[in-house]
Amino acid sequence: MKKKIKLLVATLSFSTVFFYCQSTPTTYDMTGYVVDTKVNSSGEVTVLVDGRGIETEQMLISDYGWAHISDNTDIYLNGKKVDSYPFTIDPSVVVYVTYDGLVAESYPVQGGAKTIFIED
């Protein structure tokens, strides 16, 4: 019985660590590369993400759009949460954006980012 409990605890621990250390999110609204950045007077950054050349099986809101990064945005770099990230134009860095709330249905779309995962 003790062996089964230890095995169960070990399995749950491993699963939890694996789940929280994934660099790619399981759901997101848009993915692509940062192709432009803007900084407002408050120092908040907005990034233009272009994913028109990326194929994904996930249903996305858009393949091209602006994501506003605020103090409420959670940023993950290679699976680990970070306080900030110096967003620059880099075709080798893939980002995954989850929007927070409504998105302006223009093209490119515009909205506040709830979460951004960065694969660097």
Task: Go through the PLM ranges and name each one.
Residues K4-K6, F19-M59, K80-D120:
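Short, flexible, surface-exposed loop segments at domain boundaries
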Residues V9-V17:
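Bacterial N-terminal signal peptides
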Residues L12, A67-I69, T115:
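Short stretches within intrinsically disordered, low-complexity N-terminal or propeptide regions
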Residues I61-D83:
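Beta-strand/loop nucleic-acid-binding surfaces
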